A protein has these predicted regions:
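Amphipathic alpha-helical repeat scaffolds of TPR domains
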Residues: 100-149, 154-179, 208-219
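Generic detection of long, well-ordered alpha-helical segments
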Residues: 12-16, 133, 183-184
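Long C-terminal interaction/binding lobes of large macromolecular proteins
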Residues: 186-189, 196, 200-219
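Short, Lys/Arg-enriched charge-dense amphipathic segments
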Residues: 57-63, 110-113, 179-183
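N-terminal cysteine/histidine-rich coordination modules
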Residues: 1-100
Length: 219
């Protein structure tokens, strides 16, 4: 059994480390399972949007498309993120400021039942190294919703930008699957959000990234 965010090699894939956390948002005792990619195990490439795609494994390592399994999801309240620092590693760990926002916590917990219903029994797949395409989309939708709500409640532009990058990663996954039309629809959603962020951003770096994105999408 893993504790305190400690690492263990996944028995199915030597390139993946298993971790367990707890959820800051709902405080459930239920373990939050997460996968971590071992460094230098995959040949990776960044596209023009800065999104990493995993092309092949390095010699002597198992292949994994880490984008498909990188979202960490609490099985109780379904709070989801790619950021492991938003999950509790030890009992004594202080809750990150962004997660102490009562407005966010209340809104998130209030809608848990609907969120579970929309997941439609896919939770088990989120713990798998081979989730279905539908389960991958659901996990990203949960992470996008989490980042968007955190961004609005805390007026945090970096969280709002994370929702944009998650949409672009989802587009990359769909492109690799050959679903060009679906990929383009995610890119369009990312462009709309980036446009909106650029108009309202006070954060210089976020504003710069948001301004560049529509240019890249137009290439």
């Amino acid at each position: 059994s893993l504790s305190g965010g400690s690492l263990a090699v996944n028995p199915e894939n030597s390139s993946i480390l298993n971790r367990e956390f707890n959820c800051f948002v709902c405080g459930s005792k239920q373990k939050v399972k997460a996968f971590q990619l071992k460094p230098h195990t995959q040949e990776a490439n960044r596209n023009i949007f800065g999104i990493t795609s995993y092309l092949a494994s390095m010699e002597g390592h198992d292949y994994i498309d880490f984008n498909k399994i990188r979202i960490i999801t609490c099985p109780t309240c379904l709070f989801s993120s790619i950021n492991k620092d938003l999950f509790r590693k030890t009992e004594r760990e202080k809750t990150p400021d962004i997660l102490t926002n009562q407005k966010f916590r209340t809104a998130w917990i209030k809608d848990v039942k609907n969120r579970h219903a929309s997941l439609a029994g896919k939770m088990k797949e989120l713990d798998s190294l081979n989730p279905s395409g539908e389960a991958v989309i659901k996990s990203y939708e949960l992470a996008i919703q989490s980042a968007s709500m955190l961004g609005v409640a805390n007026n945090d532009e970096s969280q709002k930008w994370q929702a944009v990058t998650l949409l672009m990663t989802l587009a990359e996954i769909q492109m690799n699957n050959g679903d060009v039309e679906v990929a383009e629809s995610y890119l369009e959603k990312a462009r709309e959000r980036a446009d909106n962020l650029f108009k309202n951003a006070g954060h210089a770096i976020v504003s710069f990234k948001a301004a560049r994105l529509p240019l890249f999408i137009g290439l």
